[in-house]
């Protein structure tokens, strides 16, 4: 779950000790068809930003960076196409789109992980974390153990794990 979104579900879900996405000098990216200043995206200036969700850490970081802006909700893997077609002036990219946007001729306006690091003296940008339903009670330690073992297996068998994960990569 996104760290921003976690605030809205913390009464029902607990953050787990294992597994998180932290952007260290890298994070969600704001892209556009053409160069523009981020202040051009501020609310009331006639520009719209495609975002992957209102509760995403990417949206919160973009708001902190830009200030308030006009936006539309677009499925994260459709944002590059929506920006390329001109449906939006810019977009906040997460996941694979962060790596492939240049192939569509889009330009980087800001890497929010880099921006966050500059603003915070080098702290990583908290993006997402693994959660477990609080009502699972006595099962939570078992879920935690299994997740820890899965992560350890992936780290011990990186080539096999990456090959498997690439099967789920959209556009990679």
Regions found by a protein language model. Name each.
Residues 1-35:
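Glycine/small-residue-rich interface belts in oligomeric ring/scaffold proteins
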Residues 8-12, 62-63, 100-103:
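Short loop/helix-cap segments at secondary-structure boundaries that form the rim of catalytic
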Residues 74-165:
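Pocket-lining segment of extracytoplasmic ligand-binding domains
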Residues 2, 55-56, 150:
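Short linear Ser/Thr-Pro motifs
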